[in-house]
Amino acid sequence: MTQRRAMLILHGKQSLNEDVRDAVADKRKQGWELDVRLTWEAGDAQRLVNEALAAGHRHIVAGGGDGTLRDIAEALALAATKASLTILPLGTANDFARAAGVPLDVSKALQLMDVAPRAVDLGEVGGKLFLNMATGGFGSQVTANTSEDLKKVLGGAAYLFTGLTRFSELHAAHGELTGPDFHWRGDLLALGIGNGRQAGGGHELCPTALADDGLLDISILPAPQEVVGTLRSLLEGGLGIDNMFIRARLPWVELKSAQGLDINLDGEPLSGEDLRFVARPGALQVHLPANSPVLGSTPLLNRPD
């Protein structure tokens, strides 16, 4: 019989969330031994995961947003444990959870604790792991809302350029991406490297990504020679910028830029001139809905030990 024991690692801001308290009480009534710990500062998630594993917990619940989820997923993977993860989405965006079909209702999300876990991949870059997506936007300054005209033409990529108020403020970076049977070099405006499908609060930069295929989805938004003219033409023609993306699906990709690259890993900043992104197949056991859109393989008949 499966041990019904778990630890909920909850973002400190959610400590007074009555829905969480009620849902935890319900799980305990259902026979779950569910302990709760709160994060307070950077590094707490990893420490609490390690403490939970040392205490014999084989099931962790991540209660928070995308950043909390990334921290806990990374800590579990680094511990090389068979412990599984349930996602309790309590953030603003909840990008991985939404794309994976995890309910946003607290009680319904915790029902997934009783569903057999599935092996999912992680992405790795610069010694850091991510569950959802690495994104990069160039020339963006987060100082104001993106103008309405730009939102119309940029669509799902608009959030990468938050702060732009005129077409002339778009700047490109010269980059080179290399992977198995793939090579692209040129000026780019934005980049998404996804294990999950969406980022920035629902924007599908990698709309067909699967979290269990051992591959990363690459989405490149190239910069045309005349950025302003091209974007204006797209706007006037009512076309979306999704038609401009170059896409690939690779086990690894190397990204180089002499100008340097600012990357966002589910809220974790990373920068560098030469970065290698690698998929880590089956690195984590996650409790997801059986019909989750990000799962492509057939589930195992037996739950992991």
Curated annotation (Swiss-Prot):
Its main location: cytoplasm. The active site is at E268 (proton acceptor). Residues 1-129 form the DAGKc domain. Mg(2+) binds at L210, D213, L215. It is an enzyme of class 2 (transferase). It is found in: Cytoplasm. One of its GO terms (cellular component) is plasma membrane. Pfam families: DAGK_cat (PF00781), YegS_C (PF19279). Its EC number is 2.7.1.-. Keywords: ATP-binding, Cytoplasm, Kinase, Lipid biosynthesis, Lipid metabolism, Magnesium, Metal-binding, Nucleotide-binding, Phospholipid biosynthesis, Phospholipid metabolism, Transferase. Transmembrane segments: none annotated. NCBIfam families: lip_kinase_YegS (TIGR03702), PRK13054.1 (NF009602), YegS/Rv2252/BmrU family lipid kinase (TIGR00147). Probably phosphorylates lipids; the in vivo substrate is unknown. Belongs to the diacylglycerol/lipid kinase family. YegS lipid kinase subfamily. This is Probable lipid kinase YegS-like. It comes from Pseudomonas syringae pv. tomato (strain ATCC BAA-871 / DC3000).
